[in-house]
Amino acid sequence: MRRRRSALLAGSFALLAVVGGIAWQTKLRRPEGRLTGVGPRMVSNQTSQPVSLYGENLRRGMKLRLSEPFDRAVPMTVVDARHAYARLPSDLTLPVGTAQVTAALSIDGQRTRSEVGLTVVNDGAFADYTLLVRSGDVLWAASTTTDALVRLDPSTGEVSHLPGGDGPSALAAWTEADGQPRLAVAHTWTPELWILDGRTGAVLRTLRAPVYATGVAVDPHRRLVVLAETVENTVRALSLDDGRELWRRDVLPDPRPLALAGDTVVVGSQGSGELETLGLDDGRTAESLGPRPGTPIVGGHTEPHARDVMGGKAPRSLLWSSSLGKLFVTSIGPNIGPNPQRMEVSMNGGVGVVDLAARRFERHLGFGAGVTEGMALDEGSKRLYVADVALGLVRALDAAALVSGDDGARKAELWRLPVLPPPDFPLAREAADYGVNGRAGAELHSGPRALALSASGAQLYVLDRFTATVAVVEDARSSQPRLERQIPLETSIGPRERRLGQVLYYADMGRSGMSCDSCHLEGHDEGILFEKTHPLRIYRSPTVRGTRETPPYFTPASTGSLAETSRVVGDRNRYMNPTLTESEVRQLTLFSATVTNLPNPYRGPDGAPPVSIALPGGGIGRPLEGRRLFDSKADCVRCHPPPLFTTDQDLSTRGHFIDVGTPRAFPLRTGDQETVFRGVGVPSLVGAWDVFPMLTTGLAGFREENGRAVPADRVPLRAMIERYSAPPHGNAAALDAQEKADLLAYLLTL
């Protein structure tokens, strides 16, 4: 019996050895998983980021490995042997002095060397203060990139940093019926609206709110809080007390600033340049407003071209005067379209006046230079203060004169005050080069972005974006205001080269009205322009986000790198007054190269597309089914291959301009456009969910109507599929309705 048991045991061990050997040999023969690409190739570390992974022999259970300086393993969601997704964590921390790093990506445990790199931009340590409000006796400022919410007591200069949530993106202050000051904080990535004690910053309650919030306004009497967001492009009203959604309305693309105006709220569309009014009680909308052909332009080089106006440009700030019954809007001015003189510099920054009751954009006061943004109004003295981020100036205007008529508006400026940067702030070039030959002064390094008034109106507070300071202007109501002091919000400006590149991106050194930001607001798209290139015609103004990987630039191609673009366009913007130095080219190139795509909001918590998504404009789409169609029946992948979905991603296929049968010119005064056609470039589809308009002409988004450009498509991706996707531009026209919905769903997740 013992011998039999021993024999059985021996046989069992032998069998196990054989099975184990077979398994071991099978494992050895199993091909090693490896990565071949990642999209996007550059991300920000300011929040968690979804990425698409491409490779060979990918299997479930694999992890993504990030090399030094992170040395992290991240879970992967593997779809098939060639496709996977991951979500990078939000704590990829880098030293304050580091602008960016490139880490190697590989499969965790991969033995062969990986050639796939991912650049991580250090936005999480690059403070960028753009928001300022007064609540009671204290000021509140916020930096979206660094998640900073800052309390500032201007009487003492005391600065306190509080957690701001994931990407604080909009602030609103008000006073409750019992006299208590309150502060609302909306967010880009935290799906919450915070209600804070306006004195201390203590969180009183948290309301569920949409992500990608871009504007917030509070009506304490109606107990309403109104938010704008840019994923679904809606404005929503929530109960201030319990957060219930009271109404929701679709609005024009990329809604940004909000202003309460009596029983309505006004929202400005960055994509279309239009204004919309919504009733506070029910969200009812009226026809949009904006500059129209013939809208008076008072001052600046575009004044003779009022008849050539084809629409508006992005409203940068809105402010309602209850005493004057007018709305003020800052922008780079009415959008000048094709004209017999071929004048193609539409930028004329200033302030517009809108009569909401008459539904009329009354006039635009142009300053002829700079980019006007933030505003503050002293209702008592009827003084309107405006900040110029491109020139480093603050102006005071007689608001009553501004609304009185064109003649009054021409004389409305009361004073202008340069806001010089602190003495230890670096300059982009020699100090002697500023303020001569008609150039802007060294004050352009400060970047006045937002304004707030003291309760008495005697002090004006200026949030300077580039220096991260709040400047205190005394005697604001007098004819001789003075810059009393500057209060720093941060101890470091971050990487010197990148910060100076930011200054150069926004600056109007040559006082031409042109800057990188005037065409590409905050590094993104901004409607259409009758533009400074040849052939001279109407083009869409494309995004800068993620473009470092996809030269050449312009249509037809005129610059082959970001550095060449910085040189050529930078010099042109200044009218060569002066030409950029080599260091300025380097700094501007660095900043432009660190403008990243936003995290895709259509991805799930694991970074992968969900099984299905609700589509903007209606319907349900299945992204993974859409990918299969993209790669086959719809024939999109031929010109838009992954990982960046453009043939410009690789040197061997870069710069091939083609004719795919899409419209060649925008049909507005074509006799004043150069309609010669040399082909179109292939845009990247990464981040396409947030692009408006599409096509080189902008005709997936706008149409011509009565001599102007009218926003026509709220979802340009849908317009592309339904109107512009017959051969030779792919073959989505052959898809049935559900297949088109699936393809749209996939494109939204790129």
Q: What is each of the regions a protein language model found here?
A:
Residues L139-A141, R182-A184, L224-V226, V265-V267, ...:
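Conserved beta-propeller blade signature
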Residues R134-G136, W174-Q180, V218-R222, L260-G262, ...:
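Residue-level detector of Asp-centered blade-edge/turn motifs that repeat once per structural unit
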Residues D153-G157, D197-G201, S239-G243, G279-G283, ...:
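Short loop/turn segments that connect beta-strands within beta-propeller blades
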Residues G21, T130, G312-S317, S321, ...:
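Periplasmic c-type cytochrome electron-transfer domains
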Residues G20-M62, F70, G109-Y129:
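Beta-strand/beta-sandwich contexts
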Residues V121-A125, L162-D166, T206-P210, R248-L252, ...:
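Surface loop/turn motifs at the tips and blade-to-blade linkers of beta-strand repeat domains
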Residues D123-D147, S169:
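Beta-strand-rich domains and repeat architectures in extracellular enzymes and scaffolds
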Residues T146-A148, T190-P191, E232-N233, S272-E274, ...:
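Short glycine/acidic-enriched loop and turn motifs that connect beta-strands
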